[in-house]
Amino acid sequence: TVPVVVHIIYDTQSDNISDKQVRDAIIGLNEDYRRLNADTSNTRSIFQGVAADCEIEFQLAKLDPQGNCTTAITRTQSALSVGANNNVKGLISWPNNKYLNIWVVNSITLSGSGTGTVLGYAYKPNPGQSTTYDGIVIRHDRMGRIGTGTSMGRTLTHEAGHYLGLDHPFKGGCFAGDNCADTPPVLEASYGCNTNANTCSNDSPNKPDMIENYMDYADDNCMNLFTDDQRAIMR
C-alpha cells in the first residue's frame, strides 16, 4: 500500500477541488491498478493474456508526519498554481520516503511545453535525486471523474506509473522500448483511439500498437491496462 498526500494548490476557489473529488481520484487509481476498472472488457483479445492486476493500492494517509490523524488533503492558496512546475513543491511537501506527494494545480508549464498543454507530470525514481523530482503534479481537471474532473482519471494512473518506474512504450521508437517485452514496440505516442495502428513491424509475432496501455497517450476511454512486465517493474 502506498500512502498518499494530496496538496491542493489553488489560485482561485474554482481550482480548490473538494475532498470528495480527491477521494474519487484515488478510487479510480486503485481500480486501474487492481484491474477492477469498468472497461477491462475493452481490452482486445490479443492483449488480454498479459493484462495485469498490479496488486498495488494507494491510500490517503491516516497520519501526518507528526503522527496526528489527518485527511491527507492539504490546501494552499498561491498564484504558483497557474503555470505550475516544480516550484509548487516548495510550498508544501511531506517526507517523500514515507508518502507519495500529489500536487493539484490550475495549469502546468514546463520548459519546452506550451502553457496548458501538459496535463500532469512525474519523474522515474532515481536514487539520490533531489526532492524536486519527487511526486506527481497534475491539473485539477484531470483529478477524479466528478467535480471539475473532465476525464476518466487516467492522467493520474499514467503519472503514478512513472513514479513507480515505468517508461512510455514509445520510448526510443521501434527499437529501444520500455524494458517490457510484453508491450509491443510503438514508433511514437498514440493519440485518439486508433485500433488499426501498427507503427512497428519488427516484433515477432507482429502485434498492433497497444493503445490500451496506460503509459501511452491515447484517449482516456481507450486506456484500460498495465501488463505483467510493467507490474514487475512497479512492484
Regions found by a protein language model. Give the residues of each.
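Metalloprotease/metallohydrolase-associated module, dominated by Zn2+-dependent proteases
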Residues: 183-235
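Fold-level signature of zinc-dependent metallopeptidase catalytic domains
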Residues: 1-30, 109
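Residue-level detector of secondary-structure boundary/capping sites
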Residues: 16-20, 93, 206, 225
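Stable alpha-helical elements in mature extracytoplasmic
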Residues: 18-25, 152-156, 230-233
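Short, solvent-exposed beta-strand edge segments and adjacent coil->beta transition regions
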Residues: 3, 133-135, 212
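Second-shell loop/turn segments in exported
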Residues: 9-19, 89, 145-147, 221-222
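Solvent-exposed, flexible loop/coil residues
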Residues: 12, 21, 77, 125-127, ...
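Metzincin-family zinc-dependent endopeptidase catalytic domain
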Residues: 27-192, 196-197
